[in-house]
Amino acid sequence: MDNKKIRERTEEEIDLRKKVLLELLELLNKKKIFSFIWGGVLLGFIRDKNFIKWDWDVEIGFYSKDFKKNWSIILKLMEENNFTVDYFNFEELKINVSKYTSKETTTFSLMGWRYDLFTGNYIRNKLNVPKKYFEKMEKIKLFGAEFFCPSPVTEYLSYIYGNWKVPLKTVNKNEYLSSKNLRKNNWFLYCKIDKFLFNLFN
């Protein structure tokens, strides 16, 4: 996506984004599936007490073991509650859903984080977060709900974004993510391992 194509969401679209997030949180909590917010949604909540209007997705995180264990349950929950499943890939530990608006307006990205035994980081593709931020989650309150997030949250945001207090209107990850966070890792090695195990036992 070109920065020239960045679009600020309307108040109505932001309200629907909030509605869907709260629905998702309630569904996961009812099934006792632990989740947390991270990335741009967390940045907006801490800095602006709201969503970032030009952000296109809402990131909901899971520990990989929880996500894999509940994979089929989560997909069934989405289907039963009228979510559109726009993309899912078990190896990538990723499910993208949308509701009430198009996926272009808001994509809800449910993603598992793998622990890398070699580096001591929690990882996704080219994303690297030290274990200490994921060891003990903290709660933040917004929209009348409680959300778990990496802790300590402001230190985590500094690690991920650098100067996170200054809004940066861009879709280029090389511009808005810190070099400590955005670098190559063993993500695809773990994808291959999970694929092998999945095929072996299914």
Region locations from a protein language model:
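Catalytic cores of NTP-dependent nucleotidyl/adenyl transfer enzymes across multiple folds
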Residues: 12, 18, 104-202
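Active-site nucleotide-donor binding segment shared across nucleotidyl transfer reactions
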Residues: 25-58, 65
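Acidic carboxylate-rich catalytic motifs and surrounding loops in phosphoryl-/glycosyl-chemistry enzymes
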Residues: 39, 88-91, 171
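Metal-dependent nucleotidyltransferase catalytic core
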Residues: 13-20, 61-92
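Non-transmembrane alpha-helical segments in soluble domains
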Residues: 22-25, 29, 75, 79, ...
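Short aromatic/hydrophobic-glycine micro-motifs
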Residues: 33, 80-84, 162-166
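Helical scaffold of the NTase/Pol beta-like nucleotidyltransferase catalytic core
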Residues: 1-38
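Acidic, glycine-rich loop-and-strand cores that form catalytic or ligand-binding grooves
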Residues: 74-121
